[in-house]
From Swiss-Prot:
The keyword Nucleus does not apply. Keywords: Glycoprotein, Hydrolase, Protease, Secreted, Serine protease, Signal, Virulence, Zymogen. This is Subtilisin-like protease 1. Residues 450-461 have a biased composition (Low complexity). The lineage of its organism: Eukaryota, Fungi, Dikarya, Ascomycota, Pezizomycotina. It comes from Trichophyton equinum.
Amino acid sequence: MGVFRFISISLAAVSAANAAQILSMPHAQTVPHSYIVMMKDDTSDDDFNHHQSWLQSTHTHNITRRATIQNAGMRHKYNFRKMKGYSGIFDEETIKDIAKDPKVMFVEPDTIISVNGKVEQSNVPSWGLARISNSQPGANSYVYDSSAGEGITVYSVDTGVDINHEDFEGRAIWGSNQVNDGDDRDGSGHGTHTSGTMVGKEFGIAKKAKLVAVKVLGNDGSGPTSGIVAGINWCVEHARQNGGNDKAVMNMSLGGSSSSALNRAAAQAVEQGMFLSVAAGNENQDARSSSPASEPSVCTVGSSAEDDSRSSFSNWGPALDLFAPGSNIISARPGGGSQSMSGTSMAAPHVAGLAAYLMALEGISGGAVCDRLKELGSSSITDVGPGTPTNVLISNGGAKGGNPKPAPGPSPNPSQPSEPQQPAPSQPGEPGESFPGEPFPGEPFPGEPFPGESSPGESAPAPAPMPPSPQHPHTPYPGGDNFDFDGYWKKYFGGEHWRKMFGSFWN
């Protein structure tokens, strides 16, 4: 009996020593009784399946005994090849039992993540497209290569997308709804706006890329971390089965308190070949305090204003990789038409769209894309913030062989905002709010400017009508009877043209 007691005590001591850490999130808004569990990297499929079977039995026993939590159990299961895990609603005793499994790396409370920008301002210019293709601010044309992101798929991990908006030309599809609200639409407008910047025919950078809507935030602009991790997992698997992760871009214009689970999920997506653009956040603070912006392997984006200064609301610090236009950006709105928003949420899709553009043009992918964006960008941003290692504003590098296209401008009657073709979906509460009646930390109420930004006018300008399609370099005999064949051949098929078009490969 004494020997048996000694062995029992020894096993208990070993179990306690190997117990996984249950992380605390004292400054975050948590989801009651909801947790994310991450397994150790060497966990096999068999071990994971065995753990789930054990969990079901243990959880059922604990709930039956106490019956204190409604709708408890596993909600999401994650499998990123090298990283496995799950989330769900569990009582305290079950969480303690889970942490004792030596295959568990850590347990993390599920926290609320929100969009990183939702402000409507009136009578402002649309300048972001023109800025990324011109060396100086104030230009009014967007110059781009006619490849325009063709063959690349962009995943909008956001509030959903109005996939029927005319700006997407049928290139947008609905992918997944991790909110599980039965509402496959963008009831906020945030996801449609960011998607328009990425791939829209009028507002977008990669005008020929495909778009997949992945809803991870509700119509109020917020959602649990567990659902966002599930959304990332879905994107990785969908891309792998549909063209490859090296042909995929993910945009996450969202953020919240630092989360090991969310950062690890984002890192797994990058490791498997995807490019991730992430908003730095709008609190005018060090971006290392939030996720997924603090994950080193993603491309973390700060916001710039029209005068090439850091937007007053933009986060800063060592986590930042790049800056992109984010103040007063006009893009698509649900139901048709356009609206203006500000935030690092608007900056990140500029980077995602340009990433898709460069991936199609140069054949690069994954982590190499962020490095290429740094090479092509200009050292233009002023007042970058404490500890920020970069002042680089993104640029498409003069759009090798590109064609000019005017950026969206004011409508003939600038006092009238661009209206949707049909009524926008009803919105429960003010979209983009963390709590009813309150704006996100560091953001103004809708209709008010950020501190230090220009005051709003009376209405937002509508985009200008689409100009005639720019002439493709291979369009035969432009100019009709006056066509200069020798000059045309020299311009488009001479060595200088091809050196410019493919210099990145040859030099």
